[in-house]
Amino acid sequence: MAYLVLIGDLIASRHSQNRKDLQDRLKAILKSLNSRVPKPVSPYTLTLGDEFQAVFNTADHVFDDMVQIMAALHPDQVRFSLGLGNITTELNPEQSLGMDGPAFYRSREGIDRLKDSGDLLYLGGLPDNWALLAEGALRLLSQRLQRWEANRFAILHGLLVGEPVKTIAAKLEISEQAVYKNIHSGGLEAVKQVLSALTGILNDCLAEDGPTA
């Protein structure tokens, strides 16, 4: 069976002005995501250094989770690598530790690539006919994300989970006009479209369980 492994890595966290606050915010957002229904099949777990990981059997919430984490940790940045493939060990439903297989290898390889490239997003394990398109889309998106303010991440997250503009504005305590301005300036509807398309492709691969071994 194919799974989707997410590894996140805080960038330059050791140089953060308030590292303890950053760690506390990371723990809080991961705890919140682990309490969501549906949960990851193996929960968000802090691992070595400033990394964390989780395992999914559906891509439905993966990208909005990533955006929510970025919003919570801003201005500190996070690189995310997704690995699609099999897990050759028994799945651990208690914590994302002690597992192995192609999905983990691809996700780990992606983190190494991101450290070299300076990008924020990587996806490995897609069939060849989708891989280059996904890589290009995520690299373009990475360049946008590095220039965003916290509110833009929060607005994108609201759009991804289907919140109306009025609700997003109330949560952020800004005007609806400011929300619409962010949507337009950041091309957020286009970003939402790209992430929705990638979610569909990933779910097709997870369901087929064919080209991801």
Model regions and ranges:
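Regulatory and interdomain segments flanking nucleotide-handling catalytic cores
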Residues: 1-213
